[in-house]
Amino acid sequence: MSLSNWPLKKENSEAYNIKNSKQITIPDGLWIKCFDCGLLMYSKVLKRNLKVCPQCSYHFQASSNERIDQLIDQGSWQPMDVHLISTDPLGFKDQKLYSQRLKDTAFKTGLQDAVQTGTGTMQGKKVCLGIMDFRFMGGSMGSVVGEKLTRLLEKATQEKLPAIILCASGGARMQEGMLSLMQMAKISSALEMHKKENLLYISVLTSPTTGGVTASFAMLGDLIIAEPKALIAFAGRRVIEQTIKEDLPDNFQSSEYLFEHGFLDLIVSRTQLRSKLIQILSLHNHSK
């Protein structure tokens, strides 16, 4: 007798019927796949490792809130200028009104703009800290970002505190035109006043750090630190290749390439960043 004619009990046939089997629903975000090595891991494992792949050390993007938790002593964070909100001086519109885009992004991220600033302690040492957030319009630098960072640096100068800025940005915000470009000079001027008081400024470059941010305060640190394999650039790779009519190296605009050519002082993994910053702050205080 052929298998097709083999008698099956009704209850057995129903037990092996896929349609009748109980389906298991897996919650969204439970698993995360590494973009670099392809490792599939629990999201909790990635979070516990500060969003660094435990297999290949690929650095996932981290939010400004996550950065604060990773770097600052618990309970010591004092935010600054949380009330500042961008306006729409040009009445700019692309696919939607800039004013509406600001509202939508604020609702989605819970942020007022692309940077959080404030003071806190790192192993008891008080610092002024600015953390850019790429989730808010690509971390673009508009008038509010520039004003908040300038006020942060002025406070650091007034209170004789070291300043640390973590950069993550696509550059100047085109929706604000010249108002965004002038922030480059404004922040740089505040840094010069901070420097004249012989105070420490540490710039930490994360992926990506590009455009007007790279062309100003990101590269003005007394110490310039970058995360591994971070994209750090001014113009885009294709723009440069089309301009100079040459092919660029594969690792061009990576933190490793910049370190090799003397643009960076250190490349530090996110898992070691807090301890390295504390070490630098201790050495700076000891040298006074």
From Swiss-Prot:
Domain CoA carboxyltransferase N-terminal: 30-288
GO terms of molecular function: acetyl-CoA carboxylase activity; ATP binding; carboxyl- or carbamoyltransferase activity; zinc ion binding
GO cellular component: acetyl-CoA carboxylase complex; chloroplast stroma
Keywords: ATP-binding, Chloroplast, Fatty acid biosynthesis, Fatty acid metabolism, Lipid biosynthesis, Lipid metabolism, Metal-binding, Nucleotide-binding, Plastid, Transferase, Zinc, Zinc-finger
Subcellular location: Plastid, Chloroplast stroma
Catalytic activity: N(6)-carboxybiotinyl-L-lysyl-[protein] + acetyl-CoA = N(6)-biotinyl-L-lysyl-[protein] + malonyl-CoA
InterPro entries: AcCoA_carboxyl_beta, Acetyl_CoA_COase_Trfase_b_su, ClpP/crotonase-like_dom_sf, COA_CT_N, Znf-ACC
Domain of life of the organism encoding this protein: Eukaryota
E.C. numbers: 2.1.3.15
C4-type zinc finger segments: 34-56
UniProt cofactor note: Binds 1 zinc ion per subunit.
Primary site of residence: plastid
Keyword Signal part of the UniProt annotation: no
Cofactor entry: Zn(2+)
Pathway as given in its UniProt record: Lipid metabolism; malonyl-CoA biosynthesis; malonyl-CoA from acetyl-CoA: step 1/1
Chloroplast among keywords: yes
Alphabetical list of NCBIfam families matching this protein: accD
Family in the record: Belongs to the AccD/PCCB family.
Known role: Component of the acetyl coenzyme A carboxylase (ACC) complex. Biotin carboxylase (BC) catalyzes the carboxylation of biotin on its carrier protein (BCCP) and then the CO(2) group is transferred by the transcarboxylase to acetyl-CoA to form malonyl-CoA.
Subunit structure: Acetyl-CoA carboxylase is a heterohexamer composed of biotin carboxyl carrier protein, biotin carboxylase and 2 subunits each of ACCase subunit alpha and ACCase plastid-coded subunit beta (accD).
Protein name: Acetyl-coenzyme A carboxylase carboxyl transferase subunit beta, chloroplastic
Species, as recorded: Pyropia yezoensis (Susabi-nori)
Biological classification of the source: Eukaryota, Rhodophyta, Bangiophyceae, Bangiales, Bangiaceae
Gene that specifies this protein: accD
